[in-house]
Amino acid sequence: MPIGVPKVPFRNPGEEDAVWVDVYNRLHRERLLFLGQEVDSEISNQLIGLMVYLSIEDDTKDLYLFINSPGGWVIPGIAIYDTMQFVPPDIHTICMGLAASMGSFLLVGGEITKRLAFPHARVMIHQPASSFYEAQTGEFILEAEELLKLRETVTRVYVQRTGNPLWVVSEDMERDVFMSAIEAQAHGIVDLVAVENSGDLT
């Protein structure tokens, strides 16, 4: 039987009694955001709204985006990425589990020097076509020219944010390339790898 979203107590400043709120609501108040599903328009709009709201609330405190995602739709993913670059606070990205396709695109989009992977996390990059075909299911047909532009956009972001040459990124995106956390660090997708059973970073 599904248990639903867990609830935790939260006390507003100046109030004596705590109220029960869902755990994600509580974590959002601490500026912790979660992408734990495929990227689609709904989760994209939710994350964008949270980033903008929390930036208005305090534009000096960093935000933290935890990612465990198999990928998803390209355009909603790019919308999240652009918002990450637009809002004033630095956004830390943390890969736990898997950051594949659009998940890895958002991972690399975190503030440079503030992108982290857990030690057993996996990262996968590839060209945007496969996730688009999956998302399509007859709803729309993506023109080849538009797909090429999207691929160029995604490739350019990886080049800019990893420091790898264009030919390396283009070659990697020809197929599914899976990486360990250490390999993702060497590839420039993350800057830090968490050390197991320790609060230290390498």
UniProtKB/Swiss-Prot annotation:
Active-site feature positions: S101 (nucleophile), H126
Keyword check for NAD: no
Group of enzyme by EC: hydrolase
Record keywords, A-Z: Chloroplast, Hydrolase, Plastid, Protease, Serine protease
A GO BP entry: protein quality control for misfolded or incompletely synthesized proteins
Pfam families attached to this UniProt entry: CLP_protease
EC number: 3.4.21.92
Reaction(s) catalysed (UniProt annotation): Hydrolysis of proteins to small peptides in the presence of ATP and magnesium. alpha-casein is the usual test substrate. In the absence of ATP, only oligopeptides shorter than five residues are hydrolyzed (such as succinyl-Leu-Tyr-|-NHMec, and Leu-Tyr-Leu-|-Tyr-Trp, in which cleavage of the -Tyr-|-Leu- and -Tyr-|-Trp bonds also occurs)
UniProt subcellular location: Plastid, Chloroplast stroma
GO annotations of cellular component type: chloroplast stroma; endopeptidase Clp complex
Gene Ontology MF terms: ATP-dependent peptidase activity; ATPase binding; serine-type endopeptidase activity
Keyword set includes Transcription: no
Superkingdom per UniProt: Eukaryota
Stated role: Cleaves peptides in various proteins in a process that requires ATP hydrolysis. Has a chymotrypsin-like activity. Plays a major role in the degradation of misfolded proteins.
SUBUNIT field: Component of the chloroplastic Clp protease core complex.
Recorded family membership: Belongs to the peptidase S14 family.
Name of the protein in its database record: ATP-dependent Clp protease proteolytic subunit
Species of the source: Buxus microphylla (Littleleaf boxwood)
Designated gene of the protein: clpP
